[in-house]
């Protein structure tokens, strides 16, 4: 009955929590020709492009710890030592151990509520909460959740109404760090996230998901700055690859989609329309200082009506294409038609594709093996 108040020092706690699963990154491969992997280049080489943060942490304190503290104090006022109640003072106790094994060390006010600096250890959930208490609630401090091998997950920051509110930091035992804004227990506002592998995100989150403007720097040298929606690249942005390739334009669910410009590291470029990661619609491909193609595209190939010309427009050939092959007699609009007829126009698209393939000859074999996968940025900052 009651609590034991005879302890002179804070009892040692055996912090051993069962392992908590973190959701695996959802990797999906799209085989449909309508949703082609992104532009034969670098965005589709991302593997584990967003390390997962998972449905993790938070409920322990928000729904378990604080209510249990308040409940126990309300139900067991008789367990407090005689002489504790006073109308004018905050009383300091070295340690109070309750019959259920919970331990509190710190200040109390005259209403028998925790006040001032204090530590509370909850035995049944193996959690330690310490910091500044007011009227029985932790308002700023740290919450420790033990992991295997003497490691801890830690929250440090502001707490309001038993939930994380304001500025705070989550430090997970695997090395991942979230630092930024919380609102009613959710990650909401501006933040910086450092992943276990060194990937860094800085930007906005809304209700636990990437949404708004942000920057992502991957450990393999890729950089993105632009708009995020639902944990994915959505809207306008700039994506840079480690070999010097740059895409600037519109994204839809991580894919080049809409109007954009792709500049290769050798100076070649495509500017025009994309659909599901492939060149489709109107666009201009420029082979640096050699030739350009201006016309219709489908599935990354000339398809429809378009014009080939040299860099300075000294000759122009109007062609009808079907997936990279001439299907009608070309019209020689400008230049020496006799000489131009000696050009095998069907090899032009092949040269375009060779340029692209050369650019994807990345030394990292692991990256090569994934360059024809569509890796989706799936669950990242779920509500906890």
List each language-model region with its residue ranges:
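Intrinsically disordered, low-complexity repeat tracts enriched in Gly/Pro/Ser/Thr and acidic residues
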Residues: 1-384
């Amino acid at each position: 009955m009651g609590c034991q108040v005879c302890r002179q020092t804070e009892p040692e706690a055996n912090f051993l929590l069962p392992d908590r699963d973190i959701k695996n990154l959802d990797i999906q491969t799209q085989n449909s020709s309508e949703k082609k992997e992104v532009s034969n280049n670098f965005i589709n080489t991302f593997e584990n492009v967003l390390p997962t943060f998972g449905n993790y942490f938070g409920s322990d304190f928000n729904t378990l710890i604080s209510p249990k503290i308040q409940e126990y104090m309300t139900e067991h006022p008789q367990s407090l030592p005689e002489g504790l109640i006073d109308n004018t003072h905050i009383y300091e106790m070295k340690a109070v151990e309750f019959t259920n094994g919970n331990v509190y060390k710190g200040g109390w006010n005259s209403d028998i509520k925790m006040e001032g600096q204090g530590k509370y250890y909850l035995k049944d959930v193996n959690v330690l909460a310490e910091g500044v208490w007011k009227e029985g609630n932790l308002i700023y401090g740290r919450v420790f959740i033990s992991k295997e091998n003497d490691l801890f997950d830690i929250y440090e920051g502001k707490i309001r109404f038993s939930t994380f509110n304001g500025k705070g930091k989550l430090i997970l035992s695997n090395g991942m760090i979230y630092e930024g804004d919380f609102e009613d227990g959710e990650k909401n506002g501006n933040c910086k996230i450092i992943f276990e592998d060194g990937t860094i995100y800085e930007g906005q989150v809304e209700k636990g998901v990437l949404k708004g403007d942000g920057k992502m720097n991957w450990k393999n040298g890729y950089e993105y700055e632009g708009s995020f929606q639902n944990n994915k690249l959505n809207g306008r942005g700039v994506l840079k690859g480690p070999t010097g390739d740059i895409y600037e334009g519109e994204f839809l669910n991580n894919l080049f989609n809409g109007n954009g410009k792709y500049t290769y590291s050798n100076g070649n470029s495509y500017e025009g329309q994309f659909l599901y990661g492939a060149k489709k619609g109107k666009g201009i491909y420029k082979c640096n200082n050699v030739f350009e193609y201006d016309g219709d595209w489908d599935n990354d190939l000339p398809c429809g009506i378009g014009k080939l010309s040299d860099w300075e427009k000294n000759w122009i050939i109007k062609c009808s294409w079907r997936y990279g092959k001439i299907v009608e007699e070309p019209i020689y609009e400008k230049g020496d038609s006799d000489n131009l007829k000696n050009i095998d126009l069907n090899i032009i698209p092949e040269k375009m594709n060779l340029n692209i393939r050369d650019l994807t000859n990345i030394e990292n074999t692991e990256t090569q093996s994934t360059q024809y996968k569509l890796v989706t940025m799936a669950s990242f900052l779920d509500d906890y």
